[in-house]
Every structure is written in structure tokens, then in C-alpha cells.
Amino acid sequence: MKIETLKKAEEFKQGHLNLVQYFLKKGCKFTVKDLGSGAVSLANSSNYERIKKAINEYDTHLEIWKDDRLVSKVWIIPYNEGIDTIADYYVSKEIDDWSNKFEKTMEQLN
């Protein structure tokens, strides 16, 4: 198995990265805000590697946009004692759908 395949599989199991991959496939873009400084670290991006870097470095607000509509705004705390914390401020159906699919997949893997 290739190293790149293993990396993708590991990222798939991380909730915050899985969320980004899921919504990128749906044609969404992301804005990332650093909670510490309040600054926008990434705006209107669909570049997975740049989004991953921005949300892996610190606690962030992640805005998910589709066709100029705010799908949701989530609070991301990566690697919170080994478990990603994702809080959906908008309680959106789209995030609920992703969450249900992600939880079912993780149950099947364990």
C-alpha cells in the first residue's frame, strides 16, 4: 500500500478533516478564522491542503459556503485529547447528515 493512500485513510478518520473532504466534494468553499487572534487565516478556499493546514494549527471557526450561501459555521478543536471536537453553531441539516454518515462509518471501522 502506498504511503499517500495510508495518509488519506488516516485523515478520513479525523472528524475535522473528514468534514472538510465531505463538503469539498459537494462543491463548498471554506473560510477559516483563528479564534485566538480573530483574524481570517483563509478566505473562500476550496484548496484542501491549505484548509487542512489552517484548521490543524489552532482552534478555529470554519465557515462552510455553497453558492454564496452560508451552509454552517462550526467550531473546530482538533486533537482535543485525541478526539476532534466539532460544534455546529447553526445546527444545520447538512452538518447533521455528515455527522450521521461519519459516525456510522466509524462504527463499522471499529
Language model segments and positions:
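Amphipathic alpha-helical segments
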Residues: E10-V32
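Short intrinsically disordered terminal tails
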Residues: M1-I3, M106-N110
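Acidic, low-complexity, intrinsically disordered interaction modules
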Residues: T31-N100
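Generic low-complexity, intrinsically disordered sequence content enriched
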Residues: E10, Q21-F23, A39, S46, ...
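Alpha-helix boundary/N-cap detector
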Residues: I3-Q14, N18, I86-N100
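Charged phosphate-binding loop/patch that engages nucleotide di/tri-phosphates or the phosphate backbone
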Residues: K101-T105
